[in-house]
Amino acid sequence: MNITSTYVFPIPYVHLETLKAEVQRLCDLGVLKRVNRSEWAAPTFIIPKKDGSVRFISDFRELNKRIKRKPYPIPKIQNLLMQLEGFQYASSLDLNMGYYHIELSPDAKKLCTIVLPFGKFEYQRLPMGLCNSPDIF
């Protein structure tokens, strides 16, 4: 796979420390790992949240163009709800950061590298934004 994009999106200074803290948190959780070299890195930008934190979004479009899609049939909500007829109890789960529970293969880790103004980081866990992430999850 020949991909060479390493464009760095500018990050507003007001959000830089918050972004660094979020990246450090994800490194501490084993989701990201700092790398010194990478032939490819997806540009990453941020979206400020209402609570003052930031969500960073990696632009995996170039990588997605080259990935062979492995679709998994995701059931429709209506069909799932119809199957609940007659049930007395139901549970609700918050799958916040759910993708991050799935470890990537060594080859996939090399492809899932992101670039920020302060360095490159390799995803160790399944990132959001890859075309196969919902199907794998």
Positions of PLM-derived features:
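Conserved hydrophobic/aromatic pocket- or pore-lining residues that grip, position, or stack substrates
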Residues: 26, 44, 59, 80, ...
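Acidic, Ser/Thr-rich intrinsically disordered and amphipathic helical segments
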Residues: 18-21, 79, 136
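Metal-dependent nuclease catalytic cores in nucleic-acid-processing enzymes
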Residues: 79-88
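Reverse-transcriptase-like RNA-dependent polymerase core
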Residues: 1-4, 47-55, 84, 93-124, ...
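Conserved pre-catalytic core of RNA-dependent polymerases
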Residues: 34-36, 88, 92-96
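Reverse-transcribing Pol proteins
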Residues: 1-72, 119-120
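Active-site beta-loop-alpha junctions of metal-dependent nucleic acid enzymes
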Residues: 65, 72-76, 129-137
